[in-house]
């Protein structure tokens, strides 16, 4: 996945979701829940699971789908 496509979703400041090749799905409710690594080769995604806060480092090469939610 190209960094520009993800950057556009972040700049729209609307919820979106990311799916990885491993089948993981990350819901991004707001731009504060996601950021790029320094070289824009990976994403850092913050998420809640069972009431606990977590983060995942997701290489852009493993992202198979990114789409805005309506």
What feature does the model see in each segment?
Residues 1-70:
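Motif-centric detector for short Cys/His coordination patterns
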């Amino acid at each position: 996945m190209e960094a520009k496509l993800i950057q556009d979703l972040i700049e729209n400041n609307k919820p979106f979701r990311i799916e990885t090749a491993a089948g993981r799905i990350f819901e991004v409710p707001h731009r504060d829940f996601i950021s790029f690594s320094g070289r824009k080769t990976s994403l850092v995604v913050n998420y809640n699971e069972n009431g606990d806060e977590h983060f995942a480092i997701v290489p852009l090469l493993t992202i198979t789908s990114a789409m805005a939610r309506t």
